[in-house]
Amino acid sequence: MSSHAATPAASAVKPVVVVVDTFGGPIRHHNPELPLIYWDDAAVTRGDGVFETLLIRDGRACNLERHSKRFAASAALLGLPEPDAEYWRAATAEAIESWPKDVDASCVWTLTRGRAATNRPSAWITVKQIPVEHLEQRH
């Protein structure tokens, strides 16, 4: 386990946000200080979407295959488009590259039905520090 995860320096790490194009377009970083979701996104208006949380430890996503399968199964249950596992892995790898390897993190994949105006799914990945109190509960 990363011993540096609960250090004071780690608390200054800003979240990483990566926007995932559900049609396979470019993966792009998003400023975590700026809004991301539109007012008419189904995640906001109806809570319509799925998410999956992964542990990032030592610069890698843990149990990636298992999480990919569960994410796809959750999307299928809601009738959302099947997430492209390779594309989501690539987006996750890109997000992790911006995260310090010695700081444990949670990585959340989010896929929503999208905006009413476009009828196009919305998707993003966030990587953020695991709260110190959660790390302390593990010991």
Where are the model-predicted features located?
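Conserved alpha/beta cores of soluble small-molecule-handling proteins
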Residues: M1-H139
